[in-house]
Design a protein with these regions (language model features):
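Short, charged, amphipathic alpha-helical segments
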Residues: 43-53
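N-terminal intrinsically disordered, cationic/polar leader segments
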Residues: 15-18, 29, 53
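Short terminal interaction segments
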Residues: 81-134
């Protein structure tokens, strides 16, 4: 029974990672809107960073726990494939989702980085204009 509990924990940690990556992706969309909005405040931008930072920390914790448990149950999964066929298939599907979401998040991060560079370049130009006019 303990082995089945470990396998369930593995699956649940992958499900949680999918959930967290979806949250990060949604927050990236919010961050993109904030960066594109000339009236957005620095606090709004910082809130998106803070949210993502928390979720990234949660993912790191999940990954560490997953690795530790996987090492314990890897032989079991290899030796009893028929017994765990459904769980293995579900976990493979979750890993595919995680890969797709990770790729999506990385793309969003690159796009937001470019938006941030543009926004901060505009802020610098405004600051220079103000200094010159004084």
């Amino acid at each position: 029974m303990q082995d089945e509990a470990y396998v369930k924990i593995l699956r649940e940690s992958l499900e949680k990672k999918v959930e967290l990556l979806n949250l990060i992706s949604n927050e990236n969309e919010i961050q993109s809107r904030v960066l594109s909005d000339p009236n957005a405040t620095p606090d709004e931008f910082q809130a998106t960073i803070d949210n993502k930072d928390k979720w990234i920390t949660d993912i790191s914790t999940l990954d560490n726990g997953f690795s530790a448990i996987f090492e314990k149950v890897k032989p079991l999964l290899e030796n009893q494939k028929p017994k765990y066929r459904d769980e293995i298939a579900r976990m493979k599907d979750l890993v595919r989702q995680i890969t797709d979401l990770t790729t999506q998040v990385e793309k969003q991060e690159k796009e937001n980085y470019l938006l941030a560079q543009q926004k901060f370049a505009g802020v610098r130009k405004q600051a220079q204009k103000i200094r010159k006019s004084q």
